[in-house]
């Protein structure tokens, strides 16, 4: 999505020294959240991302990247590494891995959103949800979306969270594409349309090193 937007450049980063000063950092999905978070921690990538966040850079987490942003990851059944692991601590939530994998189509609507996603408030979307485990919020966070149905079964659940300034954002389903487009547009406006640079950690970066 980002790569198709004029004025936006995307760079895939495998080393902390390559991170630089981007306008946005995207943590993508992964098939092994705990193992890849351990790689980020050992390589210095986590520290570099946290430093950028402290300086005001928005962080966007998708799927496994979403799970990394919380306080703790717990894997009592050994689905991934087993045991527990400290998260990046950017969002007050815990993730619990389970053996059951969720795969479903979803329809929903954005709630009232602040910051770089404010233009999406009230917009409808459709997409998919695929993940293992559940992420549970421990604090007063802004919800991004309301899911009206899973495979046409209404249950009105909520998905995606953001901190108070929408500087740390997490999304677990098909609303991701609209989020990416809106973030690019708003960050470019904030930078007087001078262009935007995004750093994205590639999926499975640990294994490809």
Predicted regions located by residue number:
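A short, aliphatic-rich alpha-helical micro-motif
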Residues: 13, 17-20, 53
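Polybasic, lysine-rich low-complexity intrinsically disordered segments
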Residues: 172, 178, 186-191
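Hydrophobic, well-ordered secondary-structure elements that form the walls
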Residues: 25, 88, 130
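Short helix-loop-beta junction
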Residues: 1-11
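Cysteine-nucleophile active-site neighborhood
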Residues: 31-126, 134
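C-terminal and late-domain segments of enzyme folds
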Residues: 10-11, 15, 105-171, 175, ...
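Terminal amphipathic helices with adjacent charged low-complexity linkers/tails
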Residues: 20-22, 27
